[in-house]
Amino acid sequence: MKMLDLQQELRENAYPGRGIVIGKSEDGTKAAAAYFIMGRSENSRNRIFATEGEGIRTQAFDESKLTDPSLIIYAPVRVIGNRTIVTNGDQTDTVYEGIEKGLTFEQALRSREFEPDGPNYTPRISGIMQVENGTYHYAMSILKSNNANPDTCCRYTFTYENPVPGEGHFIHTYMHDGDPLPSFEGEPKLVKIPNDMEAFAADLWDSLNEDNKVSLFVRYIDIKTGKYETKIINKNQ
């Protein structure tokens, strides 16, 4: 698979929706994750990321403008033991609770499907990272309608064992802007993961469409120690 320029991918797409990037730093020492949200409506743009425990939660920036909290207020990132869960909806909790019960990432997501926001039927995208005893692997998932047919849910899971240093994968909800919004197609895209978390976060944020970008979360986890650094950027301040 050809490696794509992540910044160029974002600059050329005004509305990829929500996106997850997971991979390994070039020097092989860090497990990396990024999650961004975008919005076209006032309700969707009226959000920030706020720290909650070891993860984050979306919150309304201006509570008086919040018209519908369903599908937009949730915990995108949660940590359970040596696993970090990143998703674009409340399926974060589904995966967390599934792991508590002994289910795998894929098994936990069997109880969920795409969002009920027809005619878009926004895909549920999810990722999980496991850092244990100096080893690291990750998986990504997308649950989507069958070409906007809500009678069928298509389930895809991609697992990456012993990822290559400097490589990561990018999955997002929409191919591009549209009405209705077309769901992501194909495998997660191969992208480069640099060593510098701050620079990575800045490049991602600068590349997202100025009108539509809302918030960005980036985390680098030391594969040997499990310690992590986090960067959160909110357009609303």
Spans of model-derived segments:
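Conserved short alpha-helical segments that host acidic/polar catalytic motifs at enzyme active sites
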Residues: 1-237
